[in-house]
């Protein structure tokens, strides 16, 4: 815990955990190296993204690339990244803690522990994060723009 208490926000989170009596159920990891972050993802059973505002969260893409079953609030660009029921589970109101808990339990209690969702998430992420494919699409966009008649 001492490693965590370096910022006001980190202190706020630790105090909140204590207030709700869950400090022994939460592990605050603090800053992680890239390899430590990858291992933390791989050690998880479910990736949860309860954000109220998101565009295209890198953390969701990273979890998908690593094949984690994902639960996320259906806000911003998240539904365009993750198909509900196929590549993970989305819940409607980001502040609905019961819906979030139900989605996590649905994955944990499923026969395969969310493995099928994780495999589908990885397949989609490999396709959408393919550097060569994305570079080719971007090149086509630029060529189209260059071919348009200039005023």
Give residue ranges: language-model regions:
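A short hydrophobic beta-strand element within the catalytic core of glycosyltransferases
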Residues: 47-48
């Amino acid at each position: 815990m001492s490693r965590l208490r370096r910022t006001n926000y980190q202190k706020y989170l630790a105090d909140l955990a204590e207030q709700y009596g869950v400090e022994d159920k939460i592990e605050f990891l603090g800053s992680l190296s890239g390899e430590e972050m990858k291992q933390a993802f791989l050690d998880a059973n479910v990736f949860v993204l309860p954000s109220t505002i998101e565009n295209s969260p890198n953390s969701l893409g990273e979890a998908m690339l690593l094949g984690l079953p994902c639960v996320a609030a259906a806000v911003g660009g998240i539904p365009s990244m993750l198909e509900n029921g196929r590549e993970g589970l989305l819940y409607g109101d980001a502040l609905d803690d019961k819906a979030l808990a139900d989605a996590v339990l649905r994955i944990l209690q499923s026969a395969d522990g969310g493995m099928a969702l994780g495999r589908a998430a990885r397949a989609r992420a490999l396709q959408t994060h393919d550097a060569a494919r994305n570079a080719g699409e971007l090149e086509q966009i630029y060529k189209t723009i260059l071919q348009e008649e200039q005023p």
